[in-house]
A protein has these predicted regions:
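A well-structured
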Residues: 1-204, 435-436, 444, 450-458, ...
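Auxiliary, metal-adjacent structural segments of Zn-dependent hydrolase domains
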Residues: 203-261
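C-terminal, non-catalytic "cap/extension" segments appended to globular domains
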Residues: 114-117, 127, 182, 186-201, ...
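Post-HExxH zinc-binding segment in Zn-dependent metallohydrolases
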Residues: 130, 134-144, 304-341, 345
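Short helix/strand-bridging catalytic loops that position acidic/His residues to coordinate divalent metals
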Residues: 119-131, 267-271, 294-306
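Short pre-active-site segment immediately N-terminal to the catalytic Zn-binding motif
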Residues: 207-212, 262-282
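Catalytic Zn2+-binding segment of zinc metalloproteases
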Residues: 285-300, 317-324
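Alpha-helical recognition segments enriched in aromatics with Gly/Pro capping
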Residues: 237-242, 261-263, 280, 284-294, ...
Length: 482
């Protein structure tokens, strides 16, 4: 037995080292291309910004490659940015294979069939029932996604030509304005239903108001306090990383942290003064306020009702960042006042929320298949692209082989963070939003509701947050939505 424990210790250490090394490889990832460095300088100049840094080494991190992918007018530059980022995940392929083996061993030691079954066991139902439930939810929202996909493809065909995007074919992955085609806000100018309506350019409003990163976080905090929730602790401002440090490499993927049992909450993100990051701030602060609400519960209950709740809370508040709210806080001149302008707002939301759903499901679908042995290491990439095509209707713009490891180009894979929470959060947040709008006394279309300033909505939300994980998640859902 002593031998077995020793062996387990060795493997635990190996697992931890693999995890750190994969995340480090991802965090330091850069792709070097003098052509793309020039493209990035050109994009910043076009946006009337001074180049944010010297790019004479020609190397670009993920954030800059993503900007080229979204903003360049050149098919080839977008393609190179897309391919370039996927060079950083190639070295992760072998470590990930070993990581999956060790993760499965650990799961089996505590009585689960594999690591995927362990992940699926955390939802107050059997792993099999959970998998079936997720598939049912996807089938319910799929018709809406299919319509959005069809409309978006037709607009992309107009821009890039039917020879490159034939009728009925999947959309090439580098054309949707996002490195993983997970949200499509980057193609909004191409798909805007009614051009010429008053601008909803919140990024411009942020920059016009000269809001810096800290000011944006203050604005997010102000939303929560308007609901009657406490201000963030002073330690939050002293210990958070809100801007990208100039003197060292960090993982820029935004995250929220709860670092003690004494309400030491923080965020870590490389904030840019953009609308996207304003929404991300609301999302991350949602985690922080959840941490704060349950920090006095016994340690075992210091968690969300399930991980989808944790991801959904900040997103629920972000649904209240309506044009009317943005006018109130001085980031928009005026709210849309006719049906056409309103449809533009809804299209923006669909590109963000509806477009995400299949991606939210497929990442864990791929990992469940890897952990269960249904997909062996010799088919990692092929199986990934089969799922992307099936769920998203998206295809790689160039042929991919098993020499690559494209799943590893998404942070949550090397970081071993389960992803189903984001799929669930995209469903839950609309249920939460509807319930809180009702509590706030809102009547009329839901997309026009902002709970900003409503103590009644805040009390309802806070009561649910304070439950933490002390009750099964259906009880927490009932507490907020009835």
């Amino acid at each position: 037995d002593a031998e077995r424990y020793k062996d387990s210790d060795v493997k635990r250490k190996e697992l931890a080292e693999l995890s750190v090394s994969m995340q480090s490889t991802y965090g330091k990832g850069k792709y070097c291309s003098p052509g793309l460095a020039k493209a990035m300088d050109r994009i910043e100049t076009a946006e009337k910004k001074k180049p944010s840094r010297d790019r004479s080494d020609g190397c670009l991190p993920l954030g800059e490659l993503s900007q080229v992918l979204e903003k360049s007018e050149s098919w080839d530059e977008r393609l190179e940015a897309w391919k370039g980022w996927r060079t950083i995940s190639v070295p992760l392929r072998k470590p990930y294979q070993r990581f999956a083996e060790l993760g499965n061993e650990g799961a089996r030691e505590i009585g689960f069939r594999d690591l995927g079954a362990l992940w699926r066991s955390k939802y107050d139902m059997t792993p099999e029932a959970f998998e079936a439930d997720v598939e049912r939810l996807w089938q319910e929202v799929k018709p809406l996604y299919d319509e959005l996909h069809c409309y978006t493809r037709s607009r992309l065909q107009k821009r890039w030509g039917k020879d490159r995007i034939p009728d009925g074919a999947p959309i090439p992955a580098h054309l949707l304005g996002n490195m993983w085609a997970q949200q499509w806000g980057g193609v909004y100018p191409l798909v805007e239903p009614y051009p010429g309506q008053p601008s909803l350019d919140v990024t411009r409003g942020i920059q016009k108001k000269k809001l810096d990163a800290r000011g944006m976080v203050k604005l997010g905090e102000n939303f929560f306090t308007s609901l009657g929730m406490p201000a963030l602790p002073q330690t939050f401002w002293e210990r958070s990383l809100i801007e990208k440090p100039r003197d060292r490499e960090v993982v820029c993927h935004a995250s929220a942290w709860d670092l003690s049992y004494g309400n030491d909450v923080r965020i870590k993100m490389c904030t840019e003064t953009t609308e996207d990051d304003l929404i991300t701030i609301h999302h991350e602060l949602g985690h922080n306020y959840y941490f704060t609400a349950y920090h006095q519960l016994p340690v075992l209950f210091q968690d969300g009702a399930n991980d989808g709740f944790h991801e959904g809370i900040g997103d629920t508040l972000a649904l209240s960042v309506t044009p009317e709210y943005l006018v109130k806080v001085g980031l928009l001149d005026k709210a849309p006042s006719n049906d056409k302008a309103e449809l533009n707002v809804l299209m923006r939301r669909a590109l963000d929320k509806v477009a995400f759903l299949p991606f939210g499901k497929l990442i864990d679908q791929w990992r469940w298949d890897v952990f269960s042995g249904k997909v062996g290491p010799e088919r990692y990439n092929q199986a990934w692209w089969e799922l992307v095509k099936t769920y998203q209707g998206v295809a790689p713009p160039v042929a991919r082989t098993e020499a690559e490891f494209d799943p590893g180009a998404k942070y949550h894979v090397p970081a071993n963070t389960p992803y189903m929470r984001y799929f669930l959060a995209h469903i839950y947040q609309f249920q939460f939003h509807r319930a809180l709008c009702k509590a706030a006394g809102h009547t009329g279309p839901l997309h026009k509701c902002s709970i900003f300033g409503s103590r009644a909505a805040g009390d309802k939300m806070w009561a649910m947050l304070q439950m933490g994980a002390s009750k099964p998640w259906p009880d927490a859902m009932e507490a907020i939505s009835g």
